[in-house]
């Protein structure tokens, strides 16, 4: 049982032996800076994750970061605070955990290119002319991963992959020109890193978040993880494709915002959060969602 549990609002009817309950903003901040914690896993969805990351870093805690929006909207703030407090940022996104592993857990190691992989999401095989008719239920059926509604929709439009490009720019000091995105339907290669001599290292594994989460807590050690091994003979082949810009206009928009910098990524994130909620409520169709 946890020592501390935080609720959105106070509830006198909830009690557990040995567990202290806090609530609201004060409880949220207390949990992020909990004195007994060595590492804070920030897995809050959306813009709210920025506050969690900043609270934890301000307390000198290492942050296992599963919330990419923290870097999309406040990358400079997050990284400068981490450096000031001597805290470490440990990537939890499967793609960025893969890059981190390929760089031997050194986010400042030199490289030539980062190759991020994308499954293509739930809409990858829907004819483009039929995309406006896609329902939220269809868009939530990710072919490889089980995730929350917001990120699953962002994967369907590949806005999520655009955010991951921005995340790579912050985490690894990469230029936009050093990041390549490839559609990889099998989701076995989680990302790759190319070095100056042309060598490419890839991190592979079955599509599961268990390993990235575990590794953020155990590195530099690798502990046993109850995941099935990759059956390469059964797979037979791995496939990679260029991103179809016509199918995924949100991805192109994200790259444009990454290039412009400033407040553009923050505005894009806000627009994305509002648009996805409207889509999930049935207020807009896929075409309007992709136009943000």
Where are these regions (language model features)?
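Catalytic, metal-anchored helix/loop core of enzyme active sites in primary metabolism
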Residues: 1-292
């Amino acid at each position: 049982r946890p020592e501390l549990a935080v609720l959105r609002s106070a509830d006198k009817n909830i009690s557990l032996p040995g567990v202290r309950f806090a609530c609201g903003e004060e409880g949220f901040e207390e949990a992020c800076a909990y004195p007994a914690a060595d590492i804070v896993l920030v897995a809050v969805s959306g813009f709210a994750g920025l506050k969690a990351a900043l609270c934890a870093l301000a307390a000198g805690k290492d942050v296992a970061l599963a919330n990419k929006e923290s870097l999309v909207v406040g990358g400079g703030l997050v990284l400068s605070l981490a450096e000031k407090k001597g805290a470490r940022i440990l990537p939890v996104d499967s793609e960025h955990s893969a890059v981190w592993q390929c760089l031997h857990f050194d986010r400042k190691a030199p490289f030539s290119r980062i190759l991020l992989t994308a499954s293509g999401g739930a809409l990858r095989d829907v004819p483009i002319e039929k995309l406006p008719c896609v329902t939220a239920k269809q868009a939530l059926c990710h072919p490889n991963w089980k995730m929350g509604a917001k990120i699953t929709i962002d994967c369907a439009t590949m806005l999520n992959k655009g955010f991951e490009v921005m995340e790579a720019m912050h985490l690894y000091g990469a230029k936009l020109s050093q990041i390549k995105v490839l559609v990889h339907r099998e989701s076995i290669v989680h990302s790759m890193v190319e070095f100056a001599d042309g060598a490419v290292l890839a991190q592979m594994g079955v599509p599961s978040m268990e390993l990235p989460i575990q590794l953020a807590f155990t590195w530099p050690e690798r502990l046993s993880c109850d995941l099935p091994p990759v059956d390469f003979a059964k797979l037979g082949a791995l496939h990679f494709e260029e991103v179809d810009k016509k199918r995924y206009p949100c991805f192109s928009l994200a790259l444009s915002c990454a290039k412009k910098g400033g407040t553009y990524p923050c505005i894009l994130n806000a627009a994305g959060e509002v648009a996805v909620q409207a889509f999930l409520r049935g207020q807009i169709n896929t075409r309007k969602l992709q136009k943000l």
